[in-house]
């Protein structure tokens, strides 16, 4: 009887641990929801996602918030595009029709792409040299889109729609 009680206690303990861990991962994975109801709500909830992700990213691999926000604004029309709302894809990431579980997951993938894909080596080199200004770093993202004026669009959004408007 004592062995059975010990086994039941052990099973109960491990079941409790699994439940607690599941809740932790559920809460942490869903802690930041990017909202698209209004421009300010989109910007600030997106920035909250970025801030949350940056907690687990080394400083030298982080990407300026205003640059991430500017690209999301361009790619989704302030979070209102069908691609953003049906596929949770904020950056036009196309590997087929790439769908994400959450919008914040698309931000995580964007950060991975910038930090790993050879097309953005110049971005990483400038950042390694201590350049953190979004306008300068934006110039290195020519290959993100086919539009030859894409980096000009990023700069325009940063200068006229983000800086001085939102506190990031």
Identify the role of each PLM range.
Residues 2-70, 74, 78-168:
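Catalytic cores of secreted/periplasmic lytic hydrolases that degrade extracellular macromolecules
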